[in-house]
Curated annotation (Swiss-Prot):
<dbReference type="Pfam" id="PF06857">
    <property type="entry name" value="ACP"/>
</dbReference>
<comment type="subunit">
    <text>Oligomer with a subunit composition of (alpha,beta,gamma)6.</text>
</comment>
<dbReference type="InterPro" id="IPR006495">
    <property type="entry name" value="CitD"/>
</dbReference>
<keyword id="KW-0963">Cytoplasm</keyword>
<protein>
    <recommendedName>
        <fullName>Citrate lyase acyl carrier protein</fullName>
    </recommendedName>
</protein>
<keyword id="KW-0597">Phosphoprotein</keyword>
<feature type="modified residue" description="O-(phosphoribosyl dephospho-coenzyme A)serine">
    <location>
        <position position="14"/>
    </location>
</feature>
<comment type="similarity">
    <text>Belongs to the CitD family.</text>
</comment>
<dbReference type="GO" id="GO:0005737">
    <property type="term" value="C:cytoplasm"/>
</dbReference>
<dbReference type="InterPro" id="IPR023439">
    <property type="entry name" value="Mal_deCO2ase/Cit_lyase_ACP"/>
</dbReference>
<comment type="function">
    <text>Covalent carrier of the coenzyme of citrate lyase.</text>
</comment>
């Protein structure tokens, strides 16, 4: 999936995460800001990266501002931001459910 434009999903409310995706030339770069980064930073990055790989995204800069989001919220916000950035409004729920993340 190609990132065509900058897109955002989520909020800065407690227990949420704001994911901003930007087009990049190659690779996946994740810039994380979180009050729990020392404890959960590695896991937050892992969930974002795995979700991007499942979606077939390469060439993206992700800015994530975490406010204590659970893994399922991180995944959902990443999926929404990527679909918006790619200009897609249809989700393949069967495929997403098959990830077992």
């Amino acid at each position: 999936m190609d990132i065509m434009q900058t897109a955002v999903a989520g909020s800065l409310e407690s227990s949420d995460i704001m994911i901003t995706v930007n087009p990049a030339t190659d690779g996946i770069t994740i810039d994380l800001e979180s009050s729990v980064e020392k404890q959960f930073g590695r896991r937050i990055r892992q969930v974002i990266e795995e979700t991007l790989k499942h979606l077939g995204v390469n060439g993206v800069l992700v800015q994530a501002v975490d406010k204590g989001a659970l893994d399922c919220t991180i995944q959902a916000r990443t999926i929404a931001a990527v679909h918006r950035a790619a200009g897609l409004d249809q989700y393949n729920w069967k495929e997403i459910d098959s990830w077992n993340v």
